[in-house]
């Protein structure tokens, strides 16, 4: 009789040490500036193994032991253009020492106080993220001990958002925020539907390339009543469409694409 073997053996230990510093200065009633940096030291020890089929021996899919760093810095200014117009603009950058990848991300927002009760705002920004550490240390049969994903670039996204806020009363606010997000340089498996945007397993076992895309379109609506006479509540709803393009060039629904979400909160 065949002896049973485990289907997977996932050993993963991670420790992050974070150093953050910020500097704020108010130059005038209409001009303030904020700058800062964050240094994140990441220590990892991973050995992820799976069996392709039942009763087969485990095969290593990701293995790494060491440390790396993510360094980020930003500078942001808020300028009161007039009594009704406010401009927020800045730049953010980050650098991953693991593979010497870096990104520069401009961000800006413009707010208009149309009336004492109504505000409109428009915001745009570029954002990026690194992947989970196990992704960078994937090993395949054809490459032996070589980490096939170590040179993956950041996943990047462009965010555009409109905002309308209305003060219904001293204790109640309404906010409506339509938005769109365009993602690019998303790690995907070549000629496959797989994308890290749709990751569901505890591990990744294939070589990836930064050729995927994603798109999120939606609108968030929030009604909030502030605490008064011991009662507080908030009702929020979202309508959205979330899709990604795999390495095969085909667009799919993400696993998060439920199209709507409704939440309620009440407290006394």
Regions flagged by a language model, labelled:
Residues 180-182, 203-268:
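Gram-negative outer-membrane beta-barrel transporters
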Residues 35-37, 89, 108, 122, ...:
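Membrane-embedded beta-strand positions of outer-membrane beta-barrel proteins
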Residues 1, 40-46, 94-98, 125-131, ...:
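Structural signature of outer-membrane beta-barrel domains
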Residues 1-99, 113, 172-175, 234-236:
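Face-selective signature of the C-terminal outer-membrane beta-barrel domain
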Residues 21-25, 79, 102, 110-113, ...:
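Residue-level signature of outer-membrane beta-barrel architecture
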Residues 45-52, 97, 117-160, 180-206:
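Surface-exposed extracellular loop regions of Gram-negative outer-membrane beta-barrel proteins
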Residues 15-21, 69-75, 91, 104-108, ...:
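Hydrophobic, lipid-facing positions within transmembrane beta-strands of outer-membrane proteins
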């Amino acid at each position: 009789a065949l002896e049973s073997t485990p289907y997977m053996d996932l050993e993963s230990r991670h420790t992050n040490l974070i150093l953050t510093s910020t500097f704020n200065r108010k130059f005038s009633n209409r001009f303030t500036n904020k700058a800062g940096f964050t240094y994140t030291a990441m220590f990892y020890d991973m050995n992820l193994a799976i069996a392709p089929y039942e009763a087969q021996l485990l095969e290593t899919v990701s293995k790494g032991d060491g440390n790396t760093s993510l360094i980020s810095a930003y500078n942001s200014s808020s300028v009161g253009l007039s009594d009704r117009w406010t401009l927020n603009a800045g730049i953010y950058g980050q650098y991953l020492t693991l593979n010497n990848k870096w990104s520069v991300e401009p961000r800006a927002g413009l707010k208009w106080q149309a009336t004492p009760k109504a505000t409109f705002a428009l915001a745009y920004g570029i954002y990026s993220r690194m992947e989970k550490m196990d992704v960078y240390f994937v090993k395949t049969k054809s490459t032996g001990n070589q980490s096939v994903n170590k040179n993956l670039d950041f996943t990047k996204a462009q965010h555009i958002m409109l905002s309308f806020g209305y003060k219904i009363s001293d204790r109640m606010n309404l906010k409506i925020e339509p938005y769109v997000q365009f993602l690019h340089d998303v790690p995907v498996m070549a000629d496959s539907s797989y994308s890290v945007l749709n990751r569901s397993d505890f591990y990744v076992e294939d070589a990836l390339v930064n050729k995927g895309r994603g798109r999120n379109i939606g609108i968030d609506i929030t009604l909030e009543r502030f605490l008064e006479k011991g009662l507080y509540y908030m009702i929020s709803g979202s309508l959205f469409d979330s899709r990604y393009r795999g390495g095969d060039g085909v667009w799919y629904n993400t696993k998060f694409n439920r199209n709507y979400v409704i939440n309620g909160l009440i407290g006394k």
